[in-house]
């Protein structure tokens, strides 16, 4: 969800956007996304799971979980895609994606790389899942720092 929001902000405020980094951004709905969401729904039914989510979302944890699952699993959402917004993103983009992301295949960052309107670097992180910043923090920080330190194109 955060990656999609970041893409839309970069598109709407392109004059002010100097760079965009996405990590595990879902760009459309695919079967792997739906399978991951169904597995997440089952895991959040386990004792203590909602409490762990509350560490990040406080007393809104149940609402956040329901909004996320209900939206993405709704058949009316099946055709959603970032494709219309991506060509309007003109700042440099770094799209990081875990090779083992349980919510989306490498087709997501590839779509970002193919459609974004500015320079782009798509990087697949070997052995990482949906949260590479927690799974491989040193590697993610290094990649983001290198991207941000690179001279701006043009």
Where are these regions (language model features)?
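Flexible "cap/lid" loop of the alpha/beta hydrolase fold
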Residues: 4-49
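Short, well-ordered alpha-helices that flank and scaffold nucleotide-derived cofactor binding pockets
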Residues: 11-15, 111-114, 142, 146
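Active-site nucleophile elbow and catalytic-triad environment of alpha/beta-hydrolase enzymes
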Residues: 68-85
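Short, conserved loop/helix-junction motifs that constitute active-site signature segments
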Residues: 86-90, 115-117
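Short beta-strand/loop motif that positions the catalytic acidic residue
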Residues: 89, 95-97, 101
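Conserved alpha/beta-hydrolase "acid-adjacent" motif
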Residues: 102-108
